[in-house]
């Protein structure tokens, strides 16, 4: 999977809109877990932003799930595909 700012992307969900969310891990970072929103371009390149950083994988998984659910409800968007690292 992709590495962003030293974080390996463990999981990602992309919506039909080209937006999505990712969960990353960097065991050497002070906050080893992150969730990001991203925008995926036509060539598949992703721009990551609005990171939320935490210290536990359980927290990161909950945050990832909440962000995906909130986006689905707010924009009535379907998940196009998910990836697991």
Listing of model-derived features with the role each one plays in the protein:
Residues 47, 59-62, 76-78:
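Glycine-rich loops and low-complexity Gly/Arg-rich segments
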Residues 55-72:
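A short, charged, amphipathic alpha-helix used as a generic interaction element across diverse proteins
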Residues 75-85:
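Intrinsically disordered, low-complexity charged/polar segments
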Residues 23-51, 67:
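Short aromatic-glycine-(Arg/Gly/Cys) micro-motifs in beta-strand/loop hairpins
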């Amino acid at each position: 999977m992709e590495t962003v700012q030293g974080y390996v992307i463990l999981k990602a969900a992309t919506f039909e809109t080209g937006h999505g969310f990712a969960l990353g891990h960097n065991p050497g970072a002070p906050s080893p877990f992150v969730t990001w929103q991203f925008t995926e371009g036509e060539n598949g390149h992703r721009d990551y932003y609005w990171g939320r950083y935490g210290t536990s994988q359980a927290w990161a998984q909950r945050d990832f799930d909440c962000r995906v659910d909130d986006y689905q409800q707010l924009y009535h968007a379907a998940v196009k595909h998910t990836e697991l690292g």
